[in-house]
Amino acid sequence: SQQGHHVTTKADATADRDGCVQWRLRDLQPGTRYQYEIEFAGQPLVQGDDYFFETAGSNKSSTTVRLAFGSCAREDKGSSAVWRQVRAVDPHAVVLLGDTPYIDSVDLAVQRRRHAEFAAVPDFRKLLRNRSLYATWDDHDFGRNDTDGNLEGKERSRRAFIEYRSNPSYGDGRSGIYTKFR
């Protein structure tokens, strides 16, 4: 942090989570900017001035919060232009409301591949480098067009979603993906 606080955590990328990791940091100060770097085998993978995050202010503080909402995005030039525009307005967090990405399958391998392809879009990655991401799903990333909660295989879609989206919580722990901020 700017005050010199140093926090270290470790996460293992394993095949059963498709190589996805989530870092859970503790004892962070409210309203504080933290620089970060990611290392593998002692070598930096990610580092630099643009790799930081800011914690939310305390519950007692009064501040303006800028949220960007989006949905129905693809890995194309049009969506990349939108990610650049969103980054330019400098939101504190991004909330994706579904169809990000379009998957239209409940096959776990397809789900994982599509989430990985979507996450690899350079402008999307740059946007999220220093912002929180919260997400829910809609029909195309849950299963197929116009499907509902009765879709067979939805547990595989939920598994891939949890692997690739680091929400604070996911439903009741067994089903659903809803979350809350505080």
Segment roles from a protein language model:
Residues S1-A73, A88-D90:
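Acidic, histidine-bearing metal-coordination/catalytic regions of metal-dependent phosphoesterases
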Residues G4, S61-R182:
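Active-site neighborhood of divalent metal-dependent phosphoester/pyrophosphate hydrolases
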